[in-house]
A protein has these predicted regions:
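Conserved Rossmann-fold SDR core element
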Residues: 95, 180, 190-205, 244-253
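Active-site loop of short-chain dehydrogenase/reductase
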Residues: 13-14, 66-67, 94-96, 147-160, ...
Length: 287
């Protein structure tokens, strides 16, 4: 897939919301959608209009040929999520073609997943489940209310191999497993509406924090085989461009496996490696 294949036009500009897009996977997805000519709303907790990380993401979307719109939103607050969707509906005449549920919040005092669950405070639930699962459900409800009347749309959850094997922490795995089940069950209730739900498992991602550490590998995984945030975005664009994607609704897909299926390579031309064998298998729902 070439850059030309990803480019859209103003006349057919679609509308996406990518939550948690200040950096890493969310930023990569937003930028790839920008290359495809989408209008992309990007959210984060940081202020907008001050040349912060969220503004820079929106700026890249626009530079790529899309239209980036930065919106400050604390996804722990249902009312802010509702206001966000109301603004999109008002500004885009009710149109929303894609929601990417990506926002994540670290627990209070987080310094890495270094302690077993019984040594962590109960408040971890509020971040890892409250934002990492509940906020995605709230956003999905609001998105479905916009998409179903138009008989089209896609809801994408950014999940993890932590669904399949232990990764990071108990609550992290619980939240990701919940996202996969949410996509599967939403697909059942959305059947016949034209709205597609998917969950994605990126592998090891070469994000800003990972690269800043200057590592050659992370917990045994070579960074040379890892994927960039924008690779995940290119897979999302490819799925959105598939006219038969609704037939996959409810599935969980591994990005490193979906990429070759759609002819998607990473920004450096490499093909990331799937971690399926490392975690003892693939997704429980499709894939």
């Amino acid at each position: 897939m070439t850059e030309a294949d990803l480019t859209g036009t103003e006349a057919v500009r679609k509308v996406a919301l990518v939550t948690g897009a200040s950096r890493s996977v969310g930023k990569g997805i937003a930028c790839a959608l920008g290359s495809a000519g989408w209008t992309v709303y990007v959210t984060g907790r940081g202020p907008v209009g001050v040349d912060g990380q969220l503004d820079r993401t929106a700026g890249i979307v626009t530079e790529r040929g899309g239209h980036g719109i930065a919106v400050q939103c604390d996804h722990r607050d249902d009312s802010q999520i509702r206001d966000l969707f109301a603004a999109i509906a008002r500004e885009q005449n009710g149109r929303l073609d894609m929601l990417v549920n990506n926002v994540w919040a670290a627990p209070k005092g987080f310094a890495g997943f270094t302690e077993p669950f019984w040594q962590r405070p109960f408040e971890d639930w509020d971040s890892l489940i409250g934002v990492g699962l509940r906020a995605h459900y709230v956003a999905s409800v609001e998105a479905a209310r916009m998409m179903v009347p138009r008989s089209t749309g896609m809801i994408v959850n950014i999940s993890s191999f932590g669904t399949r094997g232990h990764l990071h922490s108990v609550l992290y795995g619980m939240s990701k497993a919940g996202l996969d089940k949410m996509a599967a069950d939403m697909a059942v209730e959305l059947r016949g509406t034209g709205v597609t739900t998917l969950s994605l498992w990126p592998g090891l991602v070469k994000n800003e924090a990972m690269l800043a550490r200057g590592l050659d590998n992370f917990q045994g995984f070579p960074l040379a085989d890892a994927e960039t945030p924008e690779f995940v975005g290119r897979v999302v664009v490819a799925l959105a461009s598939d006219p038969d994607v609704n037939g996959r609704s409810g599935s969980t897909l591994i990005t490193a496996e979906a990429g070759p299926e759609y002819g998607v390579v990473d920004v450096d031309g490499n093909q990331p490696i799937s971690h399926r064998s490392v975690f003892g298998g693939g997704p429980l729902f499709g894939g």
